[in-house]
């Protein structure tokens, strides 16, 4: 079975079990899991840093992109990084909640994820209108969707950290 289909089935089944009815969000989360199978998508290159590994790194990258005197001046880069902050925090809280609880503040991740998706939602709404991806709902229902990812992990990836996907994501 293709990996994307595997994730889509797991997420849709989890949404059904949890009575979450949002097809665009389910599709987005399946795409997110598929993208984040590759470590370089979890920790992308920044404009000023070789690899963005933490939310703080990502926020610093946004600042670097806005400095006019910097060779990295690219204000449009903020939307890309904010989307990644939303995706990264959703992924980490949904799939690796215990790790976030050990290494960072879950509340901080939730607030940064919501803020990031809200920012992207407003930016996309101005340019794309109603056809925009579900960033606003991702912001508004962040905890519910992260909970759905956690549920999918426990039900559909019962091997925990030994599951091939979970091993790949942390390499």
What does each of the following model-derived ranges do?
Residues 1-170:
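Polar/charged low-complexity regulatory segments
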């Amino acid at each position: 079975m293709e990996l994307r289909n595997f994730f889509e089935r797991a997420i849709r089944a989890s949404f059904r079990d949890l009575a979450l009815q949002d097809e665009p969000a389910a599709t987005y989360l399946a795409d997110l899991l598929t993208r984040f199978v590759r470590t370089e998508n979890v920790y992308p290159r920044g404009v000023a840093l070789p690899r963005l590994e933490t939310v703080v790194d990502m926020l610093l990258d946004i600042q670097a992109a806005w400095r006019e005197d910097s060779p990295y001046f690219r204000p449009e880069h903020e939307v890309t990084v904010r989307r990644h902050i939303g995706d990264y925090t959703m992924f980490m809280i949904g799939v690796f909640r215990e790790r976030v609880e050990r290494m960072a503040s879950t509340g901080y991740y939730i607030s940064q994820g919501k803020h990031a998706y809200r920012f992207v939602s407003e930016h996309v709404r101005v340019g794309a209108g109603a056809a925009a991806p579900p960033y606003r709902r991702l912001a508004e229902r962040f905890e519910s969707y992260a909970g759905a990812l956690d549920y999918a992990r426990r039900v559909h990836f019962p091997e925990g950290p030994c599951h091939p996907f979970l091993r790949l994501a942390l390499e």
